[in-house]
């Protein structure tokens, strides 16, 4: 069984486009849970381009599965997370001008900052995941800072220019998932996964959970959110069958 974390960021993107109170990310999260989501992922960005603090506060009380809060490693976000106490937090890199996440967290370069954040969050009872590129040195650093979970960045795989390049990225993800799993980490994966590229990632036996959002929200425009979630969950389970 491989778990699906549904990222609801881009339901909030549509809401923020006009500053209305619809579509509701809260409603989307509850529908996703009813449709097979094992967790709800939401990224509280520093620029609040989509998810707002209020969304996190409300959902923390309403979710029946798990909240996986994504955030940058900043004092503001770590303090907020320690107050809200999501089940999981995934620490991600952020650049204000980025269109979306561009790569994994550089745990090596920001070792002391990430280590201190991991300690604070763990002491607050929150399970810490680090969003990293599929590289052994970053995985080793994640272990050294005490994170029990990593999320492998699948963006380079998803955005590969040729099928050969995509196959090479897939092999890297496969080998790094096995590397991390053999060293005691829970291995998740995500970013830019969709209905045509998820199966090979879901097939990797060491991967416990996929976090997928943009593609589900996009498909929901045509078939509804419940069906879009169900289809992705089914696709993932079939990959493991
Ligand atoms: C870390 C990651 O890949 C996503 O979970 C992240 O939320 C992407 O950022 P946007 O949702 O703002 O595109
Ligand atoms: N961490 C990846 C995630 O939560 C969803 O990313 P995407 O599917 O919106 O690209």
From Swiss-Prot:
Annotated InterPro entries: Aldolase_TIM, PyrdxlP_synth_PdxJ, Pyridoxine-5'_phos_synth
Source taxon at top rank: Bacteria
Major localisation: cytoplasm
Subcellular location: Cytoplasm
Binding site for 1-deoxy-D-xylulose 5-phosphate: 9-10, 45, 50, 100
Enzyme Commission number(s) of this protein: 2.6.99.2
Residues engaged in binding 3-amino-2-oxopropyl phosphate: 7, 18, 192, 213-214
Coiled-coil boundaries: none
Sites annotated Transition state stabilizer: 151
Pfam family name, one: PdxJ
Primary enzyme class: transferase
One GO location term (cellular component): cytosol
Pathway(s) where this gene product acts: Cofactor biosynthesis; pyridoxine 5'-phosphate biosynthesis; pyridoxine 5'-phosphate from D-erythrose 4-phosphate: step 5/5
GO BP terms in the entry: pyridoxine biosynthetic process
Catalyzed reactions: 3-amino-2-oxopropyl phosphate + 1-deoxy-D-xylulose 5-phosphate = pyridoxine 5'-phosphate + phosphate + 2 H2O + H(+)
Assembly and interaction partners: Homooctamer; tetramer of dimers.
Similarity remark: Belongs to the PNP synthase family.
NCBIfam families assigned to the protein according to its UniProt record, in alphabetical order: pdxJ, PRK05265.1-1, PRK05265.1-3, PRK05265.1-5
Protein name, entry field: Pyridoxine 5'-phosphate synthase
């Amino acid at each position: 069984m491989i778990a699906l974390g549904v990222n609801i960021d881009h339901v909030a993107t549509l809401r923020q486009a006009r500053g209305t109170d619809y579509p509701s990310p809260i409603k989307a999260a509850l529908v996703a849970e009813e449709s097979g989501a094992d967790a709800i992922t939401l990224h509280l960005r520093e620029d609040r381009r989509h998810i707002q603090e209020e969304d996190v506060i409300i959902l923390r009380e309403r979710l029946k599965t798990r909240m996986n809060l994504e955030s940058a490693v900043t004092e503001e976000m770590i303090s907020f997370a320690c107050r809200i106490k999501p089940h999981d937090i995934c620490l991600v890199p952020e650049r204000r001008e980025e269109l979306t996440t561009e790569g994994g967290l550089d745990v090596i370069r920001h070792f002391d900052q990430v280590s201190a954040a991991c300690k604070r969050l763990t002491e607050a009872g929150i399970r810490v995941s680090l969003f990293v590129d599929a590289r052994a040195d970053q995985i080793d650093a994640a272990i050294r800072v005490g994170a029990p979970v990593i999320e492998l960045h699948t963006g380079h795989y998803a955005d590969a220019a040729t099928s050969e390049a995509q196959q090479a990225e897939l092999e890297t993800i496969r080998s790094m998932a096995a590397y991390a799993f053999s060293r005691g980490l829970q291995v998740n994966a995500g970013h830019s996964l969709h209905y045509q590229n998820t199966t090979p990632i879901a097939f990797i036996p060491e991967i416990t959970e996929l976090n997928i959002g943009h593609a589900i929200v996009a498909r929901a425009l045509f078939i509804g959110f419940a069906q879009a979630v169900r289809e992705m969950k089914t696709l993932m389970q079939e990959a493991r069958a």
